[in-house]
Amino acid sequence: MSLQAAGTETQPHDLAARTVAVIAEHGSIEGPLLPILHAIQQEFGFVPRASLPIIAGALNISNAEAHGVATFYHDYRSAPAGRHVLKLCQAEACQSMGSDKVAAMVKQALGIGFHETAKDGSVTLEPVYCLGLCACAPSAMLDGEVIGRVDAEAIEEIVAEVRR
């Protein structure tokens, strides 16, 4: 059995060793669970379910608590993301400026919905609830870069970028 993560194959024993190494780097700080989960996601491209019991054991918390935190926060993925991650703001300010139409156009252009990755692995589409760019609504974020005043032209550019 192996895990597919960010284009590399990860064996369970390798996953355990890499998880333990991440815990060792962050385990001595106060409140280490969130930093460990961030580091695990950076290491694997997502938070593998198999890493959660290892984290729970090391931090002396229940498996349910580790799982609950990992699934509560939207930034933690349970599967690898596409090569690009496109986040579309769905907060009130963006909705009032047409984010629903933007989302519909993007979904149609990419052929995927929210929380989905294109079959070719090019892009993952995620909703986000406020990028802090309300004055330039509707807004989006592509690979960490914020884009304001998203319109049909911007959508064409975004789709072209993620399809390269």
Predicted regions and their residues:
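Signature of N-terminal electron-transfer/Fe-S-associated modules in redox systems
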Residues: 1-164
